[in-house]
Amino acid sequence: MTYNIVALPGDGIGPEILNGSLSLLEIISNKYNFNYQIEHHEFGGASIDTFGEPLTEKTLNACKRADAILLGAIGGPKWTDPNNRPEQGLLKLRKSLNLFANIRPTTVVKGASSLSPLKAERVEGTDLVIVRELTSGIYFGEPRYFNNHEALDSLTYTREEIERIVHVAFKLAASRRGKLTSVDKENVLASSKLWRKVVNEVSQLYPEVTVNHLLVDACSMHLITNPKQFDVIVYENLFGDILSDEASVIPGSLGLSPSASFSNDGPRLYEPIHGSAPDIAGKNVANPFGMILSLAMCLRESLNQPDAADELEQHIYNMIEHGQTTADLGGKLNTTDIFEILSQKLNH
């Protein structure tokens, strides 16, 4: 079997961190004996510059045919037209591929706790995964309107939308430490009352998973005071958007956090959570770890290469533990250095 991968370098530092990661993929495929082919397509601001829109039909169709999609980063101050922004291409891609589930791991590895803004003893050993519903909720609810006197956003969830994201979270928890925290605002929101009811019903299908309910404000505090207590956390869209960013600073840098977005069938999208950082683009100083860890997620989830994913992650964690990092993590290496060291480790 030959896996079909679509590469979307995007904007800013996106091309340099993605291209370097693809060089690692070539080494890994030879080492673990699997085949793949790459289609490169412009996306986001780069696509606006070339084609006048952030996501062309050609690129979208290629993504629909793919086994996996790797995205570098998109956006930047260059693209200011509110009706034609790079981010609109990502929203369209998510909707077209029905990418309803967003998965964000947060890990604080041994020796890296000093990077965190929190006390080392509070964060070392943190290993949690956030599951965020991505295509419903207040960002997509209707009706919505805005005028000079009043504005309205609608927070709507159906039973089916809640069930599908909750099943993802339960399955993930069952494969890890067997603990799921469901976050809502059940004390005031009707949508959260339905959310909690559905979670409790679905929990009957997963007796091996222990379920805990937290109100969103309490969860925001517990993420800071005791992040090690969490295994898998599931959120609706708005809560997940906010609190996944809170969780991402626990390791000390956005550059350490990968993510995956997927549907029940079809290709999955893998990308680091950081932005395009146009101020450092082309300077060879970008931290590529988030992109490389996203590649590891792709290896595990879409390319059926769990051993390769484990090896790649362990090499990264070992480098971080020994201070082999870029400047944002306190190290002295540049982007190229990171890829060269990882290439040597993988070839060893």
From Swiss-Prot:
Cofactor(s) this protein requires: Mg(2+); Mn(2+)
Pathway where this protein functions: Amino-acid biosynthesis; L-leucine biosynthesis; L-leucine from 3-methyl-2-oxobutanoate: step 3/4
Residues binding NAD(+): 76-87, 275-287
SMART domains: Iso_dh
Site (Important for catalysis): Y139, K185
GO cellular component: cytosol
Localization in the cell: Cytoplasm
Record text on subunit structure and interactions: Homodimer.
Free-text function comment from the UniProt entry: Catalyzes the oxidation of 3-carboxy-2-hydroxy-4-methylpentanoate (3-isopropylmalate) to 3-carboxy-4-methyl-2-oxopentanoate. The product decarboxylates to 4-methyl-2 oxopentanoate.
HAMAP family: LeuB_type1 (MF_01033)
UniProt name for this protein: 3-isopropylmalate dehydrogenase
